[in-house]
From Swiss-Prot:
It catalyses: an N-terminal (5-L-glutamyl)-[peptide] + an alpha-amino acid = 5-L-glutamyl amino acid + an N-terminal L-alpha-aminoacyl-[peptide]; glutathione + H2O = L-cysteinylglycine + L-glutamate; an S-substituted glutathione + H2O = an S-substituted L-cysteinylglycine + L-glutamate. This is Glutathione hydrolase 6. The gene is Ggt6. Residues 1-49 are cytoplasmic. PANTHER family: GLUTATHIONE HYDROLASE 6.
Length: 498
């Protein structure tokens, strides 16, 4: 190097890892700055001025830096092997220094009443499935582990927004039909299969495999199921949900339902959409000593109802769900600018509640699926089919709207694909349409920064136990190319994502 060469300029070298984004730069500056300052101090010492063997100093510094890094890594590996927690394998480095608050994910997320089913939904997402695959898989899982609130005998409503097409589609249950007085016709399998056929990505059999395995090998009674069993008693539910002495199973007890597993595996082999649900129906009528009904379940996919708002476009389900009532309430609420956001919580705290279940899946591109289902009462009819392990609903054939079903999606601006999206779906909330209207009004009148604070305050660890009652409101948000999930009350519904 010539003596005329200018001063050496040191530049910060930033470590790059897959998945890191621009938000990481601030954190990396804090880590890198002390190192850069130290190098600059050495550069300015008398022995390191131009003409003072700068090349030698540079090589020496590089050697010392490499030695320090290698020594540090070796020490960390040695500490890992000698850790009192045992051999944890290679040092666990975070995939990214870009951190999020709980419930915020780069790609996709699922939130449901059961930790097992939220994990199953996440597995389907990671396996290449979309939000419909994850939602349908989680719903089938809930049919196994939460028989008090949903199941193959339940009625399903859903709302799906496709970010690629910009279309929103409603899954409708069709008119309520009965097998016998007090026993509703099961429609869950035809409804979920219809939704998956049109919008899913993974094979139908793939979605049924894990729920069938849970039913066959067993699952733990979680807090919501244990609470429902304690309140319900055991009449009609033994031996599946009872101890040998006839008392109901408690928290942590193991349940196996091999007959339900067999039904799910048979349905996985259905050769055509028209045959989905037939295996279950044939076994049920045999159990009950009935003939096959002449009218088959008629779930359908229909365009969602739409309402233009100053803030964007609202989508919800058509009648006989509570969607039309929700639309009317929103129009009057937004015009009168009432109720006060503070009054929303009172709508979520009512003694008498319908029994239902809800889940939501979302991805960072804006696609989302909201599903809600009901057996009408806790454990439905209370009649456990011996050959199928299925509990039928006690829904009656009538024209009364499904007041528990009014999922909604707010698309911020159809002309801006980067705008925020919001999805809301409730379970067990009386006056559901009013509660949803109030919650949406709160969202529309709250500044964006305050919404972020509220979302963060609603989060608890994903494995939070069942600390809430039957009422829950699930919220999914797409903001800044991230998927966010939360619940009210906070922490009552486990979530997973990646």
């Amino acid at each position: 190097m010539d003596a005329t060469t200018g001063a050496v300029l040191y530049q910060k070298l930033q470590l790059w890892e897959p998945g890191m984004e621009s938000e990481e730069e601030e954190e990396e500056e804090e880590i890198a700055e002390p190192l850069v300052l130290s190098l600059r101090r050495l550069q300015n010492t008398p022995g390191n001025k131009v003409g003072g063997l700068p090349g030698a100093w540079t090589r020496l510094l590089a050697g010392l830096l490499l030695l320090a890094v290698s020594s540090s890594l070796a020490l960390r590996q040695l500490q890992g092997r000698n850790s009192p927690k045992g051999n944890l394998g290679p040092v666990d480095l975070p995939a990214s220094r870009h951190s999020h608050h709980p419930g915020v994910y780069h790609h996709s997320a699922v939130i449901s009443p059961a930790a097992t089913c939220s994990r199953l939904g996440q597995e389907l997402l990671v396996a290449g499935g979309n939000v419909v695959d994850a939602g349908v898989g989680a719903a089938l899982c809930l049919a196994v582990v939460h028989p008090h609130a949903t199941g193959l005998g339940a009625t399903f409503w859903g709302l799906f927004y496709n970010s690629s097409s910009g279309n929103s589609t409603a899954l409708t249950a069709g008119p309520a039909q009965i097998l016998a007085p007090g026993l509703g016709l099961p429609t869950a399998l035809p409804a979920l299969h219809l939704l998956h056929t049109h919008f899913g990505r993974l094979p139908w059999s793939h979605l049924l495999a894990k729920p069938a395995m849970l039913a066959q090998k067993g699952f733990e009674v979680d807090a919501p199921l244990a609470s429902a069993l304690a309140a319900q008693g055991t009449e009609g539910l033994c031996p599946l949900f009872c101890h040998t002495n006839g008392t109901p199973l408690g928290l942590g007890a193991q349940v196996t339902n091999p007959n339900l597993a067999a039904v799910l595996l048979r349905e996985a082999l259905a050769s055509s959409p028209d045959l989905v649900g037939n295996a279950l129906l044939n076994l049920l009528v045999r159990d009950l000593g009935l003939e096959l009904p002449s009218v088959q379940p008629k779930p359908s996919l229909e365009p969602a109802l739409q309402l233009l708002l100053p803030q964007g476009v609202l989508f919800t389900t058509p009648g006989p769900s509570a969607g039309p009532e929700l639309m009317g309430l929103l129009e009057s609420t937004l015009h009168s600018k009432t109720p006060s956001p503070a009054s929303c919580s009172s709508l979520l705290q009512t003694a008498e509640t319908p029994v239902s279940s809800a889940l939501a899946t979302v991805d960072s591109h804006g696609s989302m699926l909201l599903l809600t289902s009901s057996l009408n009462s806790s454990f439905g009819s209370g009649h456990l089919s011996p050959s199928t392990g299925v509990l039928l609903s006690n829904l009656e054939a009538s024209s009364v709207p499904s007041t528990w079903a009014c999922p909604l999606i707010l698309r911020g601006n159809l002309d801006d694909t980067e705008d925020d999206m919001l999805g809301l779906v409730a379970s067990g909330i009386p006056r559901g349409a009013k509660a949803m209207a109030c919650t949406l009004f709160n969202h529309l009148t709250t500044p964006q920064t305050q919404q972020q604070v509220q979302h963060q305050a609603q989060q608890r660890p994903t494995e939070s136990p069942g600390i809430c009652g039957k009422e829950a409101l699930l919220q999914v948000v797409v903001h800044a190319e991230h998927a966010q999930v939360s619940s009210i009350p906070s922490g009552c519904c486990p979530f997973q994502g990646y």
